[in-house]
């Protein structure tokens, strides 16, 4: 129901903003795709038409891929401006070149592909590869999009959570590559610490 409302909102707003959507909004479309796929798998499992997935792929698509892609979609243009303490001008959110959009689309699809890697194998290697792919995409987002290495050390207190959260999310994606046995514990860094700090 929430996904349907979100899709309706996009359809209503698209005619008004179709000439200047930020290229990073590609991630938002992929986030909706991930949530739709996860929801479909969950319904099939509950109906008994699909075997329970040991790798929890349907849960990860709904509660990890969906919010992370949303963060990359919205945060790709919003967080750098907030970190720079700049006024957000809607006119600056102009569409970028097709090559840039294609590159971001490729990154987003690669991000989603990592969940397929985990689906087809439930052993430690598939977990390492899946999280490794996601970690690379997320670290690119931090260094090349958010440019956290250039974030000033002094900024308003209300941005503290927004600055700390991406690092905890990165830790939650990197640690399963080296210690897959404790993947569920590392996911708490993403779900609880990372997402929680972003909302504060």
Task: List each model region and its residues.
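Hydrophobic alpha-helical transmembrane segments of multi-pass integral membrane proteins
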Residues: 1-200
């Amino acid at each position: 129901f929430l996904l349907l409302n979100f899709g309706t909102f996009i359809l209503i707003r698209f005619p008004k903003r179709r000439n200047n959507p930020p290229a990073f909004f590609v991630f938002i479309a992929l986030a909706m795709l991930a949530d739709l796929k996860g929801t479909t798998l969950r319904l099939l499992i509950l109906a008994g038409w699909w075997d329970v997935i040991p790798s929890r792929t349907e849960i990860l698509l709904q509660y990890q891929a969906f919010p992370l892609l949303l963060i990359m979609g919205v945060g790709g243009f919003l967080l750098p401006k907030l970190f720079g303490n700049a006024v957000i001008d809607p006119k600056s959110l102009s569409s970028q070149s097709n090559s840039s959009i294609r590159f971001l689309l490729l990154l987003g699809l690669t991000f989603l592909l990592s969940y397929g890697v985990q689906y087809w194998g439930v052993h430690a290697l598939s977990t390492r590869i899946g999280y490794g792919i996601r970690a690379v995409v997320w670290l690119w987002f931090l260094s090349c999009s958010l440019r956290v290495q250039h974030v000033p050390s002094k900024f308003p207190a209300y941005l503290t959570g927004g600055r700390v959260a991406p690092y905890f999310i990165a830790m939650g994606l990197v640690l399963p590559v080296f210690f897959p046995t404790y993947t569920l514990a590392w996911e708490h860094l993403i779900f609880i610490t990372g997402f929680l700090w972003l909302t504060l």
